[in-house]
Design a protein with these regions (language model features):
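Amphipathic alpha-helical interaction motifs in eukaryotic regulatory proteins
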Residues: 110-117, 155-159
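Extracellular/periplasmic catalytic domains that process cell-envelope and extracellular macromolecules
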Residues: 29-32, 132-135, 174-178
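Caspase-like (clan CD) cysteine peptidase catalytic core
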Residues: 24
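Gly/Ala-rich beta-loop-alpha elbow adjacent to hydrolase catalytic centers
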Residues: 40, 143, 147, 151
């Protein structure tokens, strides 16, 4: 929903003079040039869910996505303002009930597209008026941020499924989902490379801001390239995946532990680069600049939930998904 309401969708949420929310068309939405399908994934993100659980959330004291901070449904305390305390319905919050690897998420997305394009053939780009056959569905996949990693993996899986369909490994009745374009927006492509780039940018950029000194830069890059550092562990992780978990099912504990260690090491490798008092997305600006999140309040209105047929409130961030991925990266 971030992409739909804050970035490229056909409309955006605005606050009216009376404090209510409504939508208005986005002038440069991507729907000007294409049909767009936004997918909430992995399970328990956005409007996707496994089970429906009724809970109460205090947004002041709790981390709402955390399973440990959920409370049984209860009345709002008298000293707590209405905006801060909400009763709602959410996914289970269980890490065992979501995809814990990008390869598994790729499979889930392929099966979703199979179901969606079959159930709604008029949205299938492979359906042509006056024809009885369905041509290959030529789609354009765009992914952002971590999409720099999952986008290529999704693309590879779609093509592998097409090959399996051709050689008879899977039924011919499966739709051929042909990838026309893979687009990556502000993508995270490679952790060691990103860590080095962040440190270099923090030390030397065209805006004249410098928030790491030469010693921090040199120590950071040396640590990244050292034995047992970010780069070394990332390479060990890749080698272990290739030999012990080539299908990406996440069922080799030694590989999971090694890759989790690599992730943690790389996350902290360039940490000095992110200790900056300005916006990480636009270092000219203080504080953080970006589209507002009013769409969350809009989507969580009872009338909107009823209109779109969602049994759960929207969840912009899922602790269950993050914990599952961190445990088996």
């Amino acid at each position: 929903m971030v992409g739909l309401f804050q970035e490229t969708g056909p409309c955006k949420v605005v606050q009216n003079s009376d404090g209510t929310y409504s939508t208005q068309p986005r002038v440069w939405g991507w729907d000007r040039s294409s049909n767009i399908l936004f997918i909430d994934q992995p399970t328990q993100v956005g409007f996707s869910y496994d089970e429906c659980v009724n809970v109460s959330v205090d947004f002041e004291n709790d981390n709402p996505p955390s399973l440990a901070n959920r409370r049984p449904p209860s009345a709002r305390p008298a000293d707590v303002p209405d905006w801060r305390f909400k009763n709602g319905t959410f996914a289970s919050g269980l890490t065992s009930n979501t995809e814990d690897l990008t390869e598994i998420a790729a499979r889930a997305s392929w099966h979703f597209l199979q179901g969606f394009l079959s159930a709604f053939p008029h949205y299938n780009p492979g359906v042509r008026p006056g024809r009885t056959s369905v041509e290959p569905s030529d789609i354009n996949l765009f992914a952002e941020s971590y999409g720099g990693t999952y986008g290529p993996i999704f693309a590879d899986f779609y093509e592998e499924q097409n090959d399996r369909r051709k050689n008879g490994t899977i039924p011919k009745s499966a739709l051929e989902i042909r990838l026309g374009t893979l687009g990556i927006v502000n993508g995270m492509l490679d952790l060691p490379t990103a860590a080095v780039a962040a440190l270099n940018y923090a030390y030397n950029n065209t805006y004249g801001y410098h928030w790491v000194d030469l010693t921090q830069l040199q120590n950071g890059i040396s640590g990244i390239n050292a034995e047992g550092g970010c780069k070394d562990l990332a390479n060990q992780c890749r080698a272990s995946v290739a030999s012990s978990d080539p299908e990406g099912f996440g069922n080799d504990e030694a590989t999971n532990n090694l890759c989790a260690r690599a992730l943690l090491t790389c996350t902290y490798a360039g940490i000095d680069a992110y200790h900056f008092p300005k916006s990480l997305y636009d270092i000219r600006v203080t504080p953080e600049a970006g589209p507002g999140a009013s769409y969350l309040e809009y989507l969580n209105q009872a009338k909107v939930l009823q209109a779109i047929g969602s049994p759960v409130n929207i969840t912009s961030y899922s602790a269950a998904v993050q914990d599952a991925y961190n445990a088996s990266t």
